[in-house]
Amino acid sequence: MKLETVLHHYAICALWSSTQDDGEPLDAVYTSDDIAPETLESMRSDCADFIESNAEALEESGLSDEQIGHDFWLTRNGHGAGFWDRGLGEIGEALTKASKHYGEVYLYVGDDGYIYG
């Protein structure tokens, strides 16, 4: 698994599934380049830890790095899709439980125009 690929798709999914105060999705206006450095570093740290802690289950799942990043964001934040609904059985359940350990993250636009979470 390539951390940077997982992280990239995690960030894309985060922007896609998060909204501004007016309800517009963040990805309609912002890209991963707009994520504040400290928020991106936190995302990187969470993704790296998740990959390391769940390497065996992730390998067995057969999911691509892109899917892992996407599903990690959706699952940890309790969205209506994620590891649990891919038909992975016990592996999906284990990855879902592991994702929940990281808690939810809420993104917002700071006064400086960067995305924080």
Question: Predicted segment positions?
Answer:
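Long, contiguous N-terminal structural blocks used for assembly/anchoring
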Residues: 1-63
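Amphipathic protein-protein interaction modules
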Residues: 45-113
